């Protein structure tokens, strides 16, 4: 088979070809004769470029450095606390992920069984507070004597009504009434101090018209008919008018006090034995003056998850003002666990038991003590936990306390009933109606949404907390990384300064020995970087080699890392 050749450029190309032949032969000949140079050339082409030096990621403090700088002990405590906190957060995230995974597996079946799964656990109850006025003086014709005599019938009616904000029709018989969400309603009226004393204006009117004689319109608003004299005898008119004026003044005083009587408090309390369903509560009273009052509305707590208020001492520790008893116990246990206040040393608690005899404990606490007698956990009381103790125990200044006693103390003393919603309201009689002027929305528990079991509800809460924690962690990660970078830079500078300090200290103590060690170390580093270790292959394969030469190997690795060779 013939070989196709490309046309050459003529003599010049042949000449250059012949001239290149001896050089090429000499090159291959030299390459075969000098394999060492060939290996060096290959090694030079395979050497990786120097990697830029990065900041170290560890925060290890050597013992000799901690001895020189005592403040590093506090830094080490912060590092240990950070490790414990990271450990707790990691365990908490694993717990929530496990709950979310269990909930996701049964999500389809639970959505079929419980249609309210995707709804929140609270609803909103809209409350309207208003009043209407009837037979008030401004509603009457003052020129009509009959209307003036009927002023004692002036009344007002205050109405407190509520409606759940949902899609249920008002005429639906299954609709939840206003009373089903309320535990109690209390209305406290603020009575004036001089209710039974006639006003200054009333007393001043007869004095101005004393020379004109008494007037029926001003004095005798409800004068009986038998006191008037139809015969028109002028001789007796003056005496009769004086008697009428006296009786009219007494009657007017009585009427004046009756129009502003002392109002007693009104209270409605839910009775489980005799429940009453209603959408509004009406309070009707006699009066022709504005009345100030305070309305207290206490929401009904859910049986599945009773809601309670926390004491100020407990709030200062766990950071929550209200919640369930489970939330309070779990939060206080987290506080004890994070601060490492839990111990199993029971001997330190014996002295406290003698001082606790005067403290009244409930039956549940005694039962818990008996149940926990076989296995007791002791809590070290810090300054925060001491604030939870009653005054009888604070006087003895205890250092420790049983965990069961502490939890029972929280349940009995620091879990308070849910505080009512207080509203200041003024009953206005200068308007026919104030409907729509005062409207407020309050949160009430959704009974249907709270019918799930605790595991499913915790799974939903855990999923929300997991997402919230992940988002917050992503937001603070750059700040943490920046602070870690600054800390590691400071530690790196401390290490470098420590090396210089130790080097110059050795030179000051024994210059010859220190310089010889420095030369040997530099020579060893050069040998490591050049790759000429000089180790026997059989020795390197044995585990004892690494155990016996650990310090030397660590130094070699540090040399390679510091020069960017790895």
Swiss-Prot record:
Q: Give any single GO term for biological process.
A: regulation of transcription by RNA polymerase II
Q: Which organism is it from?
A: Saccharomyces cerevisiae (strain ATCC 204508 / S288c) (Baker's yeast)
UniProt lists compositionally biased (Polar residues) regions at: 39-51
Please give the family membership noted in the entry: To yeast RSC6.
Q: Which UniProt keywords apply?
A: Activator, Nucleus, Transcription, Transcription regulation
Here the segments flagged for biased composition (Low complexity) are 231-246
Q: Which is an annotated GO molecular function term of this record? A: structural constituent of chromatin
Oligomeric and partner information: Interacts with SWP82. Component of the SWI/SNF global transcription activator complex. The 1.14 MDa SWI/SNF complex is composed of 11 different subunits: one copy each of SWI1, SNF2/SWI2, SNF5, SNF12/SWP73, ARP7/SWP61, ARP9/SWP59; two copies each of SWI3, SNF6, SNF11, SWP82; and three copies of TAF14/SWP29.
Q: Where is this region: Disordered?
A: 1-56, 196-260
* Record localization: Nucleus
The protein, known as: Transcription regulatory protein SNF12
Its cellular-component GO annotations read:
chromatin; cytosol; nucleus; SWI/SNF complex
Name of the gene encoding the protein in the UniProt record: SNF12
Task: Say what the protein does.
Answer: Involved in transcriptional activation. Component of the SWI/SNF complex, an ATP-dependent chromatin remodeling complex, which is required for the positive and negative regulation of gene expression of a large number of genes. It changes chromatin structure by altering DNA-histone contacts within a nucleosome, leading eventually to a change in nucleosome position, thus facilitating or repressing binding of gene-specific transcription factors.
Q: Where is the signal peptide?
A: none
Alphabetical list of InterPro entries matching this protein: SWIB_MDM2_dom_sf (IPR036885)
């Amino acid at each position: 088979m013939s070989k196709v050749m490309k046309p050459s450029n003529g003599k010049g190309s042949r000449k250059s070809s012949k001239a290149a032949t001896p050089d090429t032969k000499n090159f291959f000949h030299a390459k075969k004769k000098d394999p060492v140079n060939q290996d060096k050339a290959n090694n030079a082409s395979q050497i990786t470029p120097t990697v830029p030096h990065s900041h170290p990621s560890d925060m290890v403090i050597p013992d000799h450095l901690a001895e020189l700088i005592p403040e590093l002990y506090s830094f080490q405590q912060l590092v240990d606390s950070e490790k414990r906190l990271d450990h707790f957060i990691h365990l908490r995230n694993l717990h929530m992920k496990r709950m979310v995974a269990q909930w996701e597996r049964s999500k389809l079946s639970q959505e079929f069984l419980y249609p309210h799964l995707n709804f929140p656990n609270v609803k909103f109850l809209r409350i309207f507070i208003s009043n209407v006025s009837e037979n008030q003086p401004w509603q009457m014709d003052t020129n009509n004597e009959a209307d003036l005599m009927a002023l004692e019938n002036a009344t007002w009616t205050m109405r407190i009504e509520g409606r759940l904000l949902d899609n249920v029709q008002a005429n639906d018989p299954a609709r939840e009434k206003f009373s089903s969400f309320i535990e109690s309603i209390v209305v406290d009226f603020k009575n004036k101090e001089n209710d039974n004393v006639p006003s200054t204006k009333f007393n001043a009117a007869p004095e101005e018209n004393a020379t004109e004689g008494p007037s029926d319109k001003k004095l005798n608003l409800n004068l009986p008919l038998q006191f008037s004299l139809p015969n028109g005898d002028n001789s007796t008119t003056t005496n009769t008018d004086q008697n009428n004026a006296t009786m009219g003044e007494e009657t007017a005083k009585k009427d004046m006090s009756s129009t502003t009587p002392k109002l007693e408090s009104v209270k409605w309390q839910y009775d489980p034995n005799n429940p009453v369903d209603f959408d509004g509560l009406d309070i009707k009273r006699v009066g022709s003056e504005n009345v100030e009052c305070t309305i207290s509305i206490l929401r009904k707590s859910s049986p599945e998850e009773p809601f309670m208020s926390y004491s100020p001492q407990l709030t200062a520790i766990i950071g929550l003002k209200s919640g369930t008893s489970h939330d309070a116990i779990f939060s206080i246990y987290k506080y004890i666990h994070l601060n490492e206040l839990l111990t199993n040393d029971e001997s330190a608690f014996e002295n406290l038991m003698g001082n606790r005899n005067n403290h009244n404990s409930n039956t549940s606490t005694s039962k818990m003590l008996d149940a926990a007698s076989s296995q007791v956990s002791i809590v070290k009381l810090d300054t925060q936990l001491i604030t939870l103790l009653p005054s009888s125990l604070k006087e003895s200044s205890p250092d420790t306390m049983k965990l069961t006693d502490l939890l029972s103390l929280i349940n009995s003393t620091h879990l308070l009933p849910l505080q009512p919603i207080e509203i200041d309201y003024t009953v206005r009689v200068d308007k026919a109606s104030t409907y729509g002027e005062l409207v407020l929305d309050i949160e009430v528990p959704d009974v249907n949404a709270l019918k799930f079991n605790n595991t499913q509800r915790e799974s939903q809460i855990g999923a929300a907390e997991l997402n919230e924690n992940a988002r917050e962690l992503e937001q603070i990660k750059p700040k943490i990384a920046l602070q870690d970078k600054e800390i590691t830079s400071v530690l790196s500078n401390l290490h470098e300064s420590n090396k210089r300090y130790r080097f110059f200290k050795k030179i000051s103590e024994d210059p010859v020995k220190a310089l010889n060690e420095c030369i040997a170390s530099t020579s060893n580093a050069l040998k490591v970087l050049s790759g000429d270790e000089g180790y026997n292959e059989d020795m390197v394969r044995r585990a004892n080699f690494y155990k016996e030469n650990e310090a030397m190997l660590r130094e070699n690795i540090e040399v390679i890392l510091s020069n960017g060779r790895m």
